[in-house]
UniProtKB/Swiss-Prot annotation:
Pathway: Quinol/quinone metabolism; menaquinone biosynthesis; menaquinol from 1,4-dihydroxy-2-naphthoate: step 1/2. One of its GO terms (cellular component) is plasma membrane. GO terms for biological process: menaquinone biosynthetic process; vitamin K biosynthetic process. This is 1,4-dihydroxy-2-naphthoate octaprenyltransferase. It is an enzyme of class 2 (transferase). It comes from Escherichia coli (strain K12).
C-alpha cells in the first residue's frame, strides 16, 4: 500500500471515528439487558439493533465532518483533530457519496430490524418514523441552513437518541411493551453520552464561538458548562441508583458504583482545568468512563438474576 493510500485510509478512519461506536452500542446493550431481565431477550433483534445504531453513529460522524468543513468551522488552529475533509484528503463529493451509502445501509438494517421485531402495523410504521427521524437528526446536527448543533440543541438530541430512544426502543422491540421505570436507565445512558458531547464542546469552545457555532457550552460559558458537566455525570449515577432502589432490588444492582470514583475524578478535573487544551485527553477518558458505568450496570443486571 502506498503512502498516499495509507493517508486516505487514515483520513477515512478519522472521519468514521470507530472509537465512538462503543458508546452507541452501550445504550442498545443496556436496553437488551433490561429486556433479558424481564424474560424478553431476542438475539436477532438485539444484533440488528446494534448494527443499526452503529451505522447511525457513523452517519452522524461523517455528517458532522461534512457540515463543519463546508461551513468552515474546523480550521487549522482548532484544538481538536482535523479530519479528512479539513485536510483536503477527502473531497465534498466523496463525503456526499459516503453519506448516501451509509443512509442506504441504515435503511436496509432498519427495515430488517422492524420486519423481524414489529408484530403490528402500528409498531412497524411507528419505528419507521423513528428511524427516519434518527437519520434526519444525525445529518442535520451540522448540515443545512440552520443546523441544530449550531444553536445549542445538540445536547437534548443526544439525550433523546442516545438515551431514551436507544434504550427504550431496543427494549420495546424485544418486549413489545413499556414500563415507566425504563426512563431511569435510559436517562442515565443519555446523560453519559451528553457528557461526551459536552467535553468535545468544552475543548472547542473558542473556535466554536469564533465561527458562530453556538453550542450549549458557548451559551452557558466556561464556568457554568463545567458545572453542567458535573451534573451530567452525577445525574447518571442518581438515575441508576433510583432504578435499583425501586425496580431491580438487588445488591448486584449497585455494581455500577464501582465507576463512581472515576466519574467524580473526571468531574473534578473538568471543574479545575479551565484551559480548553486540557479537555483534549478528557474526551477519550469520558467515553471510557461512560462505557464502564453502562457495562457495570449491565453486569449487575445479569448477576442479580443469576444470584436470585
Amino acid at each position: 500500500m502506498t503512502e498516499q493510500q495509507i493517508s486516505r485510509t487514515q483520513a477515512w478512519l478519522e472521519s468514521l471515528r470507530p472509537k465512538t461506536l462503543p458508546l452507541a452500542f452501550a445504550a442498545i446493550i443496556v436496553g437488551t439487558a433490561l429486556a433479558w431481565w424481564q424474560g424478553h431477550f431476542d438475539p436477532l433483534v438485539a444484533l440488528l439493533a446494534l448494527i443499526t445504531a452503529g451505522l447511525l453513529q457513523i452517519l452522524s460522524n461523517l455528517a458532522n465532518d461534512y457540515g463543519d468543513a463546508v461551513k468552515g468551522s474546523d480550521k487549522p488552529d482548532r484544538i481538536g483533530p482535523l479530519r479528512g475533509m479539513q485536510k483536503g484528503v477527502i473531497t465534498q463529493q466523496e463525503m456526499k457519496r459516503a453519506l448516501i451509502i451509509t443512509v442506504v445501509l441504515i435503511c436496509l438494517s432498519g427495515l430488517a430490524l422492524v420486519a423481524v421485531a414489529c408484530h403490528t402495523l402500528a409498531d412497524f410504521v411507528g419505528f419507521l418514523i423513528l428511524g427516519g427521524l434518527s437519520i434526519i437528526a444525525a445529518i442535520t446536527y451540522t448540515v443545512g441552513n440552520r443546523p441544530y448543533g449550531y444553536i445549542g440543541l445538540g445536547d437534548i438530541s443526544v439525550l433523546v437518541f442516545f438515551g431514551w430512544l436507544s434504550v427504550m426502543g431496543s427494549w420495546y422491540l424485544q418486549a413489545h411493551t413499556l414500563i415507566p421505570a425504563l426512563i431511569l436507565p435510559a436517562t442515565a445512558c443519555g446523560l453519559l453520552a451528553t457528557a461526551v458531547l459536552n467535553i468535545n464542546n468544552l475543548r472547542d469552545i473558542n473556535s466554536d464561538r469564533e465561527n458562530g457555532k453556538n453550542t450549549l457550552v458557548v451559551r452557558l460559558g466556561e464556568v457554568n458548562a463545567r458545572r453542567y458537566h458535573a451534573c451530567l455525570l452525577m445525574g447518571s449515577l442518581v438515575c441508576l441508583a433510583l432504578f435499583n432502589l425501586f425496580s431491580l432490588h438487588s445488591l448486584w444492582g449497585w455494581l455500577f458504583l464501582l465507576a463512581a470514583p472515576l466519574l467524580v475524578k473526571q468531574a473534578r478535573y473538568v471543574m479545575r482545568e479551565m484551559d480548553p487544551v486540557a479537555m483534549r485527553p478528557m474526551l477519550e477518558r469520558t467515553v471510557k468512563g461512560a462505557l464502564l458505568t453502562n457495562l457495570l450496570f449491565v453486569l449487575g443486571i445479569f448477576l442479580s438474576q443469576w444470584a436470585a
